Amino acid sequence: MSITKLARSNAFKPIPNFVRSSLRNAGVESSQNTEYPPYKPKKHHILATNLIVSYFEKGLVEEARSLFDEMPDRDVVAWTAMITGYASSNYNARAWECFHEMVKQGTSPNEFTLSSVLKSCRNMKVLAYGALVHGVVVKLGMEGSLYVDNAMMNMYATCSVTMEAACLIFRDIKVKNDVTWTTLITGFTHLGDGIGGLKMYKQMLLENAEVTPYCITIAVRASASIDSVTTGKQIHASVIKRGFQSNLPVMNSILDLYCRCGYLSEAKHYFHEMEDKDLITWNTLISELERSDSSEALLMFQRFESQGFVPNCYTFTSLVAACANIAALNCGQQLHGRIFRRGFNKNVELANALIDMYAKCGNIPDSQRVFGEIVDRRNLVSWTSMMIGYGSHGYGAEAVELFDKMVSSGIRPDRIVFMAVLSACRHAGLVEKGLKYFNVMESEYGINPDRDIYNCVVDLLGRAGKIGEAYELVERMPFKPDESTWGAILGACKAHKHNGLISRLAARKVMELKPKMVGTYVMLSYIYAAEGKWVDFARVRKMMRMMGNKKEAGMSWILVENQVFSFAVSDKMCPNASSVYSVLGLLIEETREAGYVPELDSLVNDQEVGT
């Protein structure tokens, strides 16, 4: 049995004794230039190098290093085996150290050494290391090696903030292969420049370069990144023309394109036409359904399982999010049980989805429990999800305490975290705390508050009745207030019966920005009614009738016996409507007996005014 076969067999043991013996006796080999007969074993360094490669293939990184250290003579092939092994095993820092040690000891790298160490520089995203290797490439005159040039281009495309350096290398390559083109297209796409990626793809086609399935998937991804379903359809047509429609990764990328661009009906049609489907296919469609039709996502999961597929963490994450969207607590709890039985409960992304689901379903204790179970794995999303859960249910003090605890644990908040804690302060009326966090955003963390943050603070002040301060903040905003800003002011004026100049100004601003927003007209009419200005009240209502404005009925969902039902305000067409309204009548009676008195000060009969 050869060394390589022995290494790959189940009987494989670290550093066999005969290899050690060969290494020890290496120094006493005859220096005569006699030719080895075909039956004589390979030289010691070749045996050791082959074994190093096998060690890395088996994942025995330390054994590979130990054997390498025992080699008395290390040629470029042995060094390259170590560097390539480290890079392939994701020990990128060790690959760089090994390369540095190799150069220091005077061994000149070859093109395979350089491409492997460039791969490690790319994986570490350390541009300075990659630039040093580039200098070695120039010094050794290996710039013409396509293997090295492709690796250098890949490194610059990944580590740089622009594609300038990668494009310079690309232009100097005289004979380009499919890897060259695909690397550049991928670089543009990953940097968020889908247009640049598609331009390179078009140039590739014009030069009649070989188009691989992987290159097509990147081009489709570039189309999706700029929401260009038209370009995606053109690529789809070329897929059929080139005979790649049986290539599942290509077909999955096209399905993802339709989903990301919001073409759900086309995505579903395409999905049903696909002859072959894998886990990625199903996950792609379920993920899109979670965003657009959560109840259908849950039904699709039933079909998924009926066809023998087994869910992974990504599947469960989409399903838990679907339950959160429609507040399907029972379904979410069932999924949680399955997640636990599958051993996925340690996955932090899934845990974050569960925290969010329980919070949106109003079950804060279970959100806290899941949050507590990942105490050693929490990331920024974990803290943010729990803060949002606290804030949306009025636990402002708990959200503030959690924010302070997060900061003290060494996690630096971002803009979304500040939005979460400010929103919690807004719902709980913690004005001073909210203003404190608003002020430290820029001074301590260097985060410039965006429009949403300003609107949140305006609403915080407005809800607390500090309408004058809220208006002053609007005046100081570094950008023009939008309809949400003025809407927050208007809502505060109505809630606190502040029916003066500010309320009318806010209403006028919202109507200018969103002239067809019916809620503004309704609110302004309420303000006029509260002030006793019935002429103005009638004028606003007449405007609404002339514009044909009618307030859109709100929609909601409810889960009954594992089936999701949707319903609207005053819905008489729902199943068992008579029973539903009978129960509603009983609930109204109970609320009255409990002492609830509805606010009727500004109530106007909508039927009379035609809205």
From Swiss-Prot:
This entry's Gene Ontology molecular function terms read: RNA binding
User: According to the UniProt record, where is the region Type E(+) motif?
Assistant: 562-592
Q: Name one GO biological process term.
A: response to abscisic acid
Q: What stretches of residues are PPR repeats?
A: 44-74, 75-109, 110-144, 145-176, 177-211, 212-246, 247-281, 282-311, 312-346, 347-377, 379-413, 414-444, 450-480
* Any one annotated GO CC term: mitochondrion
Using the UniProt annotation, give all residue ranges assigned to the region (Type E motif): 485-561
Q: Sorted alphabetically, which keywords does the UniProt record give? A: Repeat
Q: Which family does it belong to?
A: Belongs to the PPR family. PCMP-E subfamily.
| Official protein name in the record | Putative pentatricopeptide repeat-containing protein At1g56570
Q: Which species?
A: Arabidopsis thaliana (Mouse-ear cress)
Lineage of source species? Eukaryota, Viridiplantae, Streptophyta, Embryophyta, Tracheophyta
Q: Which gene encodes it?
A: PCMP-E64
